[in-house]
Design a protein with these regions (language model features):
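Core beta-strand elements of the Rossmann-like FAD/NAD(P) dinucleotide-binding domain
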Residues: 5, 141-150
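An anion/pyrophosphate-binding glycine-rich loop and adjacent beta-alpha core
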Residues: 38-40, 56, 83, 184-323, ...
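Glycine-/small-residue-rich beta->alpha transition segments that form the dinucleotide
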Residues: 150, 155-159, 317, 330
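A glycine-rich dinucleotide-binding beta-alpha-beta segment and adjacent secondary-structure elements
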Residues: 309-375, 403-416, 534-588, 593
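Internal hydrophobic alpha-helix adjacent to the cofactor/substrate pocket in enzyme cavities
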Residues: 381-402
């Protein structure tokens, strides 16, 4: 073995989780290295060429507010931008962009190269060195040894990766990368509770083989309505491409059903559990037998490639069946498949074996992020990566680690779900998972999280200065709207011009904005736009005012829950002695070892009566 270096933090993997982990750790001043099997795979998008979406867009904004990289990268490399769910309430508005996957990789690679204090190594990590229950080093395929204080595992689908297409399978990571099998054995030897999950991806096809005249066009939002992901992005935005929608049909479904036993999933070859909320096309046809069609979103992979991505049509059926069912779709009659669809099975950890800091309970100093923790999605991975990298660095530097409660963020909700409830299939963030989604909107992520990022060392001076400037603008406008009075004649004229029934009388701007039909631009047409107020900030202020009553109610809920969060449970608390608890509750509490009464109350199988008994026991214990 050749000793080659010593670091505070080593990150294994440079996908979406690994990038954020490495950047965060180095930004905090930890001596950091990131290891990847290929520099050409940094920030790779092996599945959909997009960032954001429902709930995921909020995660990206939260990442950015904390000082992460993903939002900036998405803004620099987007092709088309759309705000989803605009017809619904602001709690579920979600920014999503199509991304140039090659430019995204190049942006992220360069971002890591420019990060001070970060070393980048192309090498496969084949083992961990663990002593007395704590990680001490790593070993590479070339017999290189590095000593380390903390390690972040961000292995994606490479860990024990196995690809399936029909009855063919081979060991592999995504996009032709080789699988990391030796590391799996090292993790098992260290005692980590591993399991098998699987995911899939659709075919990539040649643009020239699609008859777009037979598809529905899906344009982006008007250029004057586009919003960036990053609170640091000021450059004007414009859409560069269009996306399209095709549909399966009964013939497509018949081809799939006639060949369903040739699917490795239905033929029993695949052991891993697949994602519930991103099923393969064969899953959709079987599970939703009453549906005559399913949409397929046709998305470009970049400006300088002819590859098109078929979102909604992932499959593990054999190539001949793929050719047949894709070509049965209107507009795809002459489709040319460049890369066949496939399923990939991989190793991940039971996330209930992790602390809320994302540190392993089994091996101290070892952190997990992304698909290793049982999640799916680039955004979920990146958000965990930032938290894991930050905490690994603070652990290595002897500083307090960060735990984000559920009420602070979607990231806090995601982590709490993972470590408290666990997962039975790849976890995807959704707005319905948060009980506080009206206060956890994508527009206020900076207010919620940038002060935390600053306190914990991630938010740099330029971001902090801009944050303070934005908050000053918002506060000044809140005061102005609270004081400004609109005369009846002026308000009636503005409403008539907007095609609205005129109000009976004028009033204070803030009170008028509580009405559903009155919007900021109408009020501003009378009293003028506030200094520094952009359409994006105007929408944010209007949401705060219109939903003030609901937001206040959620704030009261948060304060009530916080009381339980403050009731701490000693690490060595003995649940077996609490005969008032059900057997299931005792077993789950002893296994998960919640940090406080609030977390205990969210464990599946722990009832309100169990929580009440535990509360009494804790009071007696103190």
């Amino acid at each position: 073995m050749n000793h080659l270096g010593d670091y505070d933090v080593i990150v294994i993997g440079a996908g979406h989780a690994g990038i954020e982990a490495a950047h965060a750790a180095a930004t905090l001043g930890a001596r950091t290295a990131v290891f990847t099997m290929s520099l050409d795979a940094i920030g790779n998008m092996p599945c959909n060429p997009s960032i954001g979406g429902t709930a995921k867009g909020t995660l990206v904004r939260e990442l950015d507010a904390l000082g992460g990289v993903m939002g900036l990268a998405a803004d620099a490399t987007y092709l088309q931008s759309r705000m989803l769910n605009k017809g619904k309430g602001p709690a579920v508005h979600a920014l999503r962009v199509q991304t140039d996957r090659k430019r995204y990789h190049e942006y992220m690679k360069h971002a890591l190269e420019l990060t001070p204090g970060l070393a980048i190594h192309q090498a496969e990590v084949v083992g961990l060195e663990v002593e007395n229950g704590r990680v001490k080093g790593i070993v590479t395929q070339l017999n290189g040894e590095y000593t380390v204080k903390c390690v972040v595992l961000a292995t994606g689908t490479n860990l024990g990766g196995k690809i399936f297409v029909g009855d063919a399978w081979y060991a592999s990571g995504p996009d032709g990368m080789h699988a990391a099998n030796a590391l799996t054995e090292s993790l098992k030897a260290a005692g980590l509770p591993l399991r098998r999950f699987k995911t899939g991806t659709p075919a990539r096809v040649h643009r020239r083989s699609i008859d777009f005249s037979r598809l529905e066009c899906q344009p982006g939002d008007p250029d004057n309505e586009l919003q960036p992901f990053s609170f640091m992005t000021d450059a004007p935005m414009h859409n560069k491409v269009e996306c399209w929608i095709a549909y399966t049909n009964p013939e497509t479904h018949k081809i799939i059903l006639d060949n369903i036993q040739r699917s490795p999933l239905y033929g029993g070859m695949i052991e891993g559990v697949g994602p519930r909320y991103c099923p393969s096309i064969e899953d959709k046809v079987v599970r939703f037998a009453g549906k005559d069609r399913h949409p397929i979103f046709v998305e470009p992979c970049g400006e300088n490639t002819e590859e098109m991505y078929l979102q909604g049509a992932s499959s593990s059926l054999p190539e001949d069946v793929q050719n047949a069912f894709y070509r049965s779709i209107k507009g795809f009659e002459h489709i040319e498949i460049l890369r066949p669809a496939y399923a990939i099975e991989y190793d991940c950890v039971d996330p209930t074996s992790l602390e809320a800091t994302l540190e392993s309970k089994v091996v101290r100093g070892l952190y997990g992020a992304g698909q290793f923790n049982g999640t799916s999605g680039y955004e979920e991975a990146a958000a965990q990566g930032l938290l894991a990298g930050l905490n690994a660095a603070r652990n290595a530097l002897g500083k307090e680690q960060l735990i984000l409660p559920r009420h602070t963020s979607y990231l806090g909700t995601l982590v709490d779900d993972l470590v408290t409830k666990g997962v039975m299939d790849p976890y995807r963030m959704m707005t319905s998972r948060s009980e506080y989604r009206l206060t956890l909107r994508q527009d206020n992520a900076d207010t919620r999280l940038t002060p935390i990022g600053r306190e914990y060392g991630l938010v740099q001076d330029d971001r902090w200065t801009k944050y303070q400037h934005t908050q000053n603008i918002l506060e000044a406008e809140r005061r102005r709207l609270h004081d400004a009075h609109l005369r009846t004649a002026d308000l009636q004229a503005a409403m008539t011009a907007a095609g609205l029934a005129p109000a009976a009388e004028g009033g204070i701007a803030e009170e008028l904005l509580r009405r559903p039909e009155i919007h900021y631009d109408l009020v501003a047409g009378v009293i003028g736009w506030g200094e520094g107020i952009t359409p994006m900030l105007a929408e944010r202020l209007e949401t705060e005012i219109k939903y003030a009553g609901y937001i206040a109610r959620q704030d009261r809920m948060i304060r009530e829950v916080a009381r339980h969060e403050k009731t701490l449970i000693p690490e060595d608390f003995e649940y077996a002695d609490l005969t008032g608890l059900t057997l299931e509750a005792r077993e789950k509490l002893a296994r998960i070892r919640p940090k406080n009464l609030g977390q205990a109350s969210r464990i599946p199988g722990v009832s309100p009566s169990d929580v009440a008994q535990l509360s009494i026991a804790l009071a007696a214990h103190t």
